[in-house]
From Swiss-Prot:
Disulfide bonds: none annotated. The gene is pyrE. It comes from Pyrococcus furiosus (strain ATCC 43587 / DSM 3638 / JCM 8422 / Vc1). It is an enzyme of class 2 (transferase). 5-phospho-alpha-D-ribose 1-diphosphate binds at R91, K92, K95, H97, E117, D118, V119, T120, T121, T122, G123, G124, S125. This is Orotate phosphoribosyltransferase. The keyword Glycosyltransferase applies. Its cofactor is Mg(2+). PANTHER family: OROTATE PHOSPHORIBOSYLTRANSFERASE, URIDINE 5'-MONOPHOSPHATE SYNTHASE.
Amino acid sequence: MKEELIRMILEEECIKFGHFILTSGKESSYYIDIKKLITNPKALRLIARLIKEKAEEEGIQFDKVAGPELGAVPIATALALETDRPLLIVRKKKKEHGTGRQIEGEVKEGDRVLLVEDVTTTGGSVLRAAKILKEAGAEITGIFVVVDREEGAKEAIEKEGFKLYPLVLVHELFEAAGVSSE
C-alpha cells in the first residue's frame, strides 16, 4: 500500500520544483504539495488505512485523533472516520471571537491522542500542536506524517519525547520519480 501512496503522490504531481519558502522559513528547491493529494477521497482513504495499520503494528493506543490546521485536518478527519475515534483540530492561534478556543473538540486529562501532519520539515508546526494538546491534558502517543522531508523533524520530535512515524520519506519519492534529492 505504501507503493500505491507513492504512485498517487507522483501521479497527482505533488512535487513542485522551483524556489520556495517553507512554513519553517527554510528555502527549498522543491515543494511537496500534499494538499493536491488530500483533496482526493481515494488517497485520503489510503492514507487513513496506512496510518491505522501502522499504529496497530506499533501497538499505539489512542482515544482521539488530532491534526493542526490546515493541511492535517482532512487527514485527521479521514483517520477519525476510519478508526471511529473523535476528532480534534488544533488551531494555529486561539480564535479571537466566539469560544476563543485553540482546540476544536473535547480534550480531557489523560486522553491518548494520535497526532497527524501532512508534511514535516523541521517539525515545528506539529510540535506546536503537540504542546497545545499536552497543555490541555492530552498524552501524545504518536505523530504520523504523510511525507517527511528528512530535514530534522524526526530528531526535533524525538528530542521532545515523541516518536515520528512517516508514511513516506522524501528520498523514497525522489527515487520513485527517478530524480536526485540534491
